[in-house]
Amino acid sequence: MKINSKNAFTKCRDDDFAICSLDVKKGWIGIEPEQSSFGLYYYVLKGSCKFGVTLKKGFDIIKEGDFYCTKDKLYDHFIIEALEDFCMIGFNTLDKPQDWNGRIVNEDILKVEKDGMLICFDGSPVVEDQQLAMFDYGSVHSGQEYSIDVTEGVLGLFTKC
């Protein structure tokens, strides 16, 4: 038997969120049933894929560097087809009714308006003189400012709605 996919799911914070990853070869096709799907955002590390909802017309093509929101698909079965070797990291709620906002951090000074989480998706960005690695995460607090250097990495910021 040939294994052509690797995936992982890790609960990260007192029933708040989890990080998942999917690493597959070109041509891989997978279906995520609605009852198993808690992903709200995905960051694509490499490759590209078709991402669609089963039994609905159309699909999105997501590719390396894309930050893809799937809130509108949270209560649907979805399908992924890898158009090339493909890897993505996902941010998951652990309670479907709990909504989160998410975005990629691009600024040098992060001014936080709500308590939230920073997650390293790729590379080795620096937050407050601390170098991070992929999957590192930590809390940020309302009213605080954080010095950020993302020239060597990608950070996501997530806050509860």
Question: What are these model-derived regions, one by one?
Answer:
Residues 97-149:
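Acidic/His-leaning functional-site neighborhoods
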Residues 55-75, 129-146:
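Short acidic-glycine-tyrosine-enriched beta hairpin
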